[in-house]
Each structure stands twice: as structure tokens, then as C-alpha cells.
Amino acid sequence: MNTVSNYLSALREAMKAQGLDALVIPSADPHLSEYLPAHWQARRELSGFTGSVGTFVVTVDEAGVWVDSRYWEQAAKQLAGSGIELQKSGQVPPYNEWLATNLPENAAVGIPSDMVSLTGKRTLAQSLTAKNIRIEHPDDLLDRVWSSRPAIPAETVFIHDPAYVSETAAEKLARVRAVMAEKGADYQLVSSLDDIAWLTNLRGSDVPFNPVFVSFLLIGKDNAVLFTDQGRLNAEAAAALQTAGMTVEPYAQVADKLAQIDGALLIEPNKTAVSTLVRLPESVRLIEGINPSTFFKSVKSEADIAHIREAMEHDGAALCGFFAEFEDIIDNGGSLTEIDVDTMLHRHRSARPGFISLSFDTIAGFNANAALPHYSATPESHSTISGNGLLLIDSGAQYKGGTTDITRVVPVGTPTAEQKRDNTLVLKAHIALAEAVFPENILSPMIDAICRKPLWQAQCDYGHGTGHGVGYFLNVHEGPQVIACAAVPGPQHAMKKGMVTSIEPGLYRPGKWGIRIENLAANQAVANPQETEFGSFLYFETLTLCPIDTRLMDTAMMTDGEIDWVNRYHAEVRRRLEPLTEGAAKAWLIKRTEPLAR
């Protein structure tokens, strides 16, 4: 078994053989995915740091992993004694600046071409240019050092059940081609896997939690080529591609195909790996912009939203069963760990119709663990749920008819007045945005302040964004919209009818507890639009169906309108979920949706 020290030695030997002064190994794949197949988990394997995001840098005599504050504690433990330094992003210079400072003039930096985007390479090059430091792509180096490297995944590709699809692949391609024509593009290269899955109406299981498949898609004016291995397509998928006018070529041949084109190529530079463009003729003109399909797939049809509502009902019923079982065990003196919560949730969800998988790793954090917004319990490091405290559960699932993502906080034992105060502040923030009416096309970062106002008034805040887009039986995180005051507003953030977005304010007390209340919501046109000169307005239709624990609400802090919102929401939750529950789950649902009174 290779140790990190063995890997470091092997990396440095390989670097020396190739004339490299430094090697950069990012958390990335050729599709710039959030979740990576094992084949591209080189940073995790070679550094020993298992967090989901980080950048590993090796020089002749130094090594470091750059991680953000979510992972400082984890990285400190995992890197201890390895010869790799923890570099705390935000407190130290970024890795590109560190390289520029620490490397000599005319040095060579290696980075695998399939693990860096065009934008990423440009940013790195800009930092290194003053010292004339060149960038090279040692694409065989990782394979030689990582002898047990897993193969590129090639799981079966299948169609998205036509009962849940409201637009054919051919119709989607026609919409993309219309945008290509507007921009003067002869081709578009699509590298992001959720865009490809959406455009083809196909799904897969190559990537954990995301129903996508490793591939590229090259769209021409009158043809389209899907780069994936033909043998992994089931009969229905192969027939569907033929019907849509798409041909199939091997995954590895995308760069060869691009070497044969001419004219203008539309790409999204921060979603396109350098490896795909290495043989692109110099005569080809690049047109850069966000993938047209990113905008199209963010707007769900009425039929899509109807299916999402149904998925939410099944998800909510599963949660009722889970919480009923959880409370019964805890109230009767039983013992559960954070790991048990994950296992129980999966069991209840997997019994529901249309369930495919979880949509991300469940976050179950008790007390101080919940103060880490992206905490993940492991068999080696987790807490037992006992005594008094707060349990935060952020979880979700993939169903044929939609993707779910929900966060709830429940008390264990007797909550304190401070815990109820914090929870009520978060609830007030959630309600403020959930009830908002806003102009269509407003830039999504601009509405974040609506949510944060109740917390700001109490001189509280949270460090993460308030909302992200959610796919339709696709990735739980998608764009282009993002509700986050830290985001620089741009035209890509325009809020459109049919978008599905999370609303998830939080409040975190390090070492004590964390609170987050998350529902998904769809942008809908207001019921009675006013015919005025001010344009069209939207509101949020709450999609998620699960009680919010009233035991943590301080009604003295709430307005009559906020209490009314809770009661209307709980009445809808009960109405929709009661027919889908029975026994203990139904009893729990009724108990937790009793009207809130002062």
C-alpha cells in the first residue's frame, strides 16, 4: 500500500525526469465537475487529504494543500506528519501567487491538462508571467505514480423516463442552434455533464449523487456528436440518440474531432478543460460564453414542476417516517449516532416510488458539529446523539421526477432560550425571502439582503450563500442563479419564471451549535399581475414538504404574519402528506403540524 511519503517521493522523481520545478494537482476533471469520479481523485489519493475541494502543490523541497475554512480542522489532522503543509485559503496567498513568489525565474510548473480549465490556466499563467515561468502538461505523470488508478467510469447510460420529459432532445438542440446562430458559432462544445444529460435526455451513474455520465457533446449546425463509449448505451438510449440526430464516437476522441473543424467554436471557458482543445486548429475562432443549455435547463416547464411537486411529496412522506422513528428511539432512551441518521434516512427514502439515489452526502451534525456548514460524519469521526442539544440534518434525494434538498433542525432533550432565539431568527430570515415578491429578471444576488435582514438586525450573519439552483433529476447544485451577496451580480443571474432555487439561511455558533432551515422554491408569476409600467413580478412557490419544528420557535419574537406563514405552510404539508403516510409517520406528521399559537 502506498503511503503519502512514498507518493511524494515518486512525484518528485517523476517531476525531475520531466524537468518540472512544481506540480499542481487540483480537485478537477475534464468536465470541471463538483463531484469527481474516482479516476480524477488524484489530489485525494496522493496527498491523503480526503475533503471534496483542495489544491495539492508539490515542489522539489516543499508541498502544500490549499483548502478553505470548511476543511481546516480535517486537513490539519490528515496532513499531520506527512511532509505536506496545510495552507489555509484566505489566510495565505493563493497557490498561484505562492508559486510566483517561491519559484525561480524560468521555472516550469506542471498541471494535468484534463484537470484545469481554460480560465484556470489563464489565471495561473497571468500570475507566473513576470518571472517567465512556463506551464507544462505532464499528462502521463499521474498514471505512472498512481499505479492503482481506477479506470474512467463507464456505467450504463439510460433514457430519462419519457413520462417525466417535456421537451425532446431534438427540440433542445434546435434551441441551442438558434443561440449559436445569433453568436455566429458553427459549433458548440459542451463539456459539463449536467448540460449534456439535459440536452440528450439521458442519465447515468458515473458520478456519485449526480445522475450523469462522462461524455462530451459537439453540436454543429446540422449534426451533433456525443463522445462516450457506444457499448455503455442501453438499447433505448442508443435509439433515442439516433432519433435526435446524434452520432456516437469514443470518449477519448474529442480532441481528435476538434482538430478537424473550422469556423467558430462556442465554449464556456471555465467549464472547458485544456485537454480538449490541445489540437484545435489556430484558424478556429473561439466564442466564449455560458453554455446556452445552462440557461434553458434552469427554467423548468410547468410539467417539470408538477413532477417535482410529486417527488417532494414522496420525499416528505419519507422524512415523516424517519423523524417518527428517530424521535421514538431518542424519547425512549435509545442511542443513535450521526452515521445512524444517514442510514435511517436512506432506508426511508429508498422505499419511496421513483427513488434513484441520494443527491449528496447527508450532513447530520449534532451540537458543535452542526456549526460546520459542510460537516460530514465518518466512521472514524462522529458524534452520538444524546443529552440536550440540536441536531441539524441537510439531506436530499434523486427521484425520476425531481431532485430534493432540505435542511431541518430538531431539538434533542430540552432546548435553551438562546437556541430557540437563534432558530427563530433563522426562521424569520427564511420567511422573509419565502414571502418575497420581486421583479422578473432581477439579478439573484440582489435579493439576498431580503433574507439576511432579520439576522443583520440582530447583528448576526452566516458565511455561505442563501440559495443555489437545483436540477430536475440532475445536479443538486446548478446555475446560473445564485442568491448570495458575495456574488458579483451579472446578467446571467436574471431570475426567470420556472427556476428552482434553495432558500437556506443559517446561524452558526462555533463549538456550540448550527442552525439552517432550507426549502426549495420555484419562481412563479404572481397570481394577480398588475397591469402597470413596472413589468412582471414573481414570487416563490415553496416546494419542499416537511414540518419545521415548532418546539424551537419563540413566538414572542415573531410577527402575526410570520406565525400565519408557519401555520399555512404546515396546513399544506399536512394536506399533501397525510394521504401518503400511515401509522407512526402519520401520527408524527399530525403532531408536528399542529397550529402555532402565541
Where are these regions (language model features)?
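Active-site neighborhoods and metal-handling regions in enzymes and metal-associated proteins
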Residues: 1-598
